[in-house]
């Protein structure tokens, strides 16, 4: 029987994963809180102490730091000497290590964190097990991200958990532990940047870089301009997150954490022109992100309007010469790599909330046409564009889009009809090719009726209301094509 050690701080999916492992004939060993959760779920699991024959001591500081654990992980199965030594010492082989670390980054992100709290959240045993298992990836499967549970189980079931895949998991482990160590170094070095002020002049603020992630705002290379302000950083982060969703050339403009214009095109110049035309008034003083290099032609377009920050993966030398004529504009060069395992957290009174970032995009084949009329190809393109954008808009959110740009955005309203009114009234165009996109379901048919009054012929929304049929009936009454996705995208 194969053996697996499970010790996780992020309990997402661990019960289901552990149950599946037992069905695949794995014997499970665990520690502390992870074992308690598995015990409560009636998952067969033994204590790591049953391997080490040594109790957890020092409030759990020493649990897995033992030859019985690390010998079983590090043994080279192809070396008889290693196997003989294990046998002599009565040590069992460990075939899988599932570990994620104490939440150091989240802990120190709290501005009121104490030194003792920070120190207690420095994981020792976890990184040691991860690094040992990753080193021996030819024989041991190492999982650090819950997002990998599903594929590991699939590969175990179809016997495709090969060395190449285990190596890919190994790389994730060393990336994770490197970022973890970097966060510790940054915290104790006091790596924080004092900002002029916070959201308003009466608020003090500073920027703490908690990891060495080169594809984030924290790791951006500033090529020109004044120091980034608190609001610049927040807006730039929102802009970057949205532009990364696009594979085709794309441009995103953001004001006050909401996109005001999003455009795509065959070239990055076309994409920016579409984003600019989407709302040429609101883009003034905004943040713009582009997912292609800034060319001289594009630089001339950008230079012609007032922007606070311009973000791109690269600026040509000539483009920089043009843009640097404005001494205050901030130019940020950023790796546009997407990290599917990113988390986000927000402080609340007495604590903070942590969640995975809302990066999920429903595949078109999983969306469902619920009306008598089906969308045209152009309407589908408009819907899919808008569906990428709407998670970045404050709820309640309604977007109008065609197949190349947003044409109207209603953000942050207390009711869905109000958001729709704003989007429809501000729309630069409405025709049969424009789609209305909603981040949440319609509680009744009034939003669809309002859309029909303005000539909308295609709607995409999550569905899920007990009165879904009212909206569907209203769409059918007006010959509107409606698609439901089954996934909402609230943003608070």
Swiss-Prot record:
<keyword id="KW-0378">Hydrolase</keyword>
<dbReference type="Pfam" id="PF01808">
    <property type="entry name" value="AICARFT_IMPCHas"/>
</dbReference>
<protein>
    <recommendedName>
        <fullName>Bifunctional purine biosynthesis protein PurH</fullName>
        <ecNumber>2.1.2.3</ecNumber>
        <ecNumber>3.5.4.10</ecNumber>
    </recommendedName>
</protein>
<comment type="pathway">
    <text>Purine metabolism; IMP biosynthesis via de novo pathway; IMP from 5-formamido-1-(5-phospho-D-ribosyl)imidazole-4-carboxamide: step 1/1.</text>
</comment>
<dbReference type="GO" id="GO:0004643">
    <property type="term" value="F:phosphoribosylaminoimidazolecarboxamide formyltransferase activity"/>
</dbReference>
<comment type="similarity">
    <text>Belongs to the PurH family.</text>
</comment>
<dbReference type="GO" id="GO:0006189">
    <property type="term" value="P:'de novo' IMP biosynthetic process"/>
</dbReference>
<dbReference type="InterPro" id="IPR016193">
    <property type="entry name" value="Cytidine_deaminase-like"/>
</dbReference>
<dbReference type="InterPro" id="IPR002695">
    <property type="entry name" value="PurH-like"/>
</dbReference>
<keyword id="KW-0808">Transferase</keyword>
<dbReference type="InterPro" id="IPR011607">
    <property type="entry name" value="MGS-like_dom"/>
</dbReference>
<dbReference type="GO" id="GO:0005829">
    <property type="term" value="C:cytosol"/>
</dbReference>
<dbReference type="GO" id="GO:0003937">
    <property type="term" value="F:IMP cyclohydrolase activity"/>
</dbReference>
<comment type="pathway">
    <text>Purine metabolism; IMP biosynthesis via de novo pathway; 5-formamido-1-(5-phospho-D-ribosyl)imidazole-4-carboxamide from 5-amino-1-(5-phospho-D-ribosyl)imidazole-4-carboxamide (10-formyl THF route): step 1/1.</text>
</comment>
<feature type="domain" description="MGS-like">
    <location>
        <begin position="1"/>
        <end position="144"/>
    </location>
</feature>
<keyword id="KW-0511">Multifunctional enzyme</keyword>
<dbReference type="Pfam" id="PF02142">
    <property type="entry name" value="MGS"/>
</dbReference>
<dbReference type="InterPro" id="IPR024051">
    <property type="entry name" value="AICAR_Tfase_dup_dom_sf"/>
</dbReference>
<dbReference type="InterPro" id="IPR036914">
    <property type="entry name" value="MGS-like_dom_sf"/>
</dbReference>
<keyword id="KW-0658">Purine biosynthesis</keyword>
